[in-house]
Design a protein with these regions (language model features):
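The feature captures the beta-strand-to-loop junction immediately N-terminal to the Walker
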Residues: 36-38
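Conserved ABC transporter NBD signature motif
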Residues: 59-67, 76
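ABC-fold ATPase nucleotide-binding domain signature/coupling loops
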Residues: 119-143, 147, 152-154
Length: 206
């Protein structure tokens, strides 16, 4: 499990323009974090640095005291679930879209997760093939969140992942994530729901 992700003096510039500098923070297992800021402030860039996708930064990023550059990408992929605002849908069954062909995930787990993300209507259609018109944008986004739950990683990073959800579904899902003591939860958002603000251990403003 990832117990801590630590950023020390992290900075990033693009075409000689400084986007941010001297970011110092720690993300710990069982705690909730939000990264906020105006468009262009570098929120998604910071997430890509944390995920190991962007290597053009200054400073240090460590997972459990190991520099991210020393960690195999495949290991990072197994340790962290990332959910963006677009969920990739495979031309396969709904079940395989949720489990990513992991046969160790059983039916009851899938049903439980679909209930958590308010996709109960899809339970009878688990073995139906998914087409582009099969799901609404909001359903696709909730499918992506369900997929992340099912991977059982203890780090969940969401980048504007609630953008296509109505307020009630967004609240339902975020409330569950904020209540989960087994995971480190990091969200990037333009708009945090006010009634959930006190549930974040730290809010990082860029």
């Amino acid at each position: 499990d990832i117990e801590e992700i630590k950023l020390t003096n992290v900075g990033y510039s693009f075409k000689d323009k400084e986007i941010f500098k001297n970011i110092n923070c720690s993300f710990e297992k069982g705690k909730n974090y939000a990264i906020v800021g105006e468009s262009g402030s570098g929120k998604s860039t910071l997430i890509n640095i944390i995920l190991g996708n962007n290597k053009q930064y200054s400073g240090s990023v460590k997972y459990n005291d190991v520099e991210i550059s020393d960690i195999e990408e495949s290991q990072l992929f197994k340790s962290v679930s990332y959910i963006g605002n677009i969920t990739h849908i495979y031309h396969d069954s709904l079940r395989n879209n949720l489990t990513l062909w992991d046969n160790k995930i059983n039916e009851s787990e899938i049903i439980n997760i679909l209930k958590q993300v308010n996709l109960i209507d899809l339970i009878p259609r688990l073995d139906d093939e998914v087409s582009m018109s099969f799901l609404s944008e909001g359903q696709k986004q909730r499918l992506g969140i369900a997929r992340a739950y099912l991977t059982k990683t203890n780090v969940i990073i969401m980048d504007e992942s609630m953008a296509n959800l109505d307020r009630d579904n967004a609240f339902l899902i975020e409330n569950q994530l904020l209540n989960d003591p087994t995971r480190m939860y990091i969200t990037v958002s333009h708009h945090l729901q006010e009634k959930l603000l006190d549930r974040f251990h730290s809010i990082i403003t860029l």
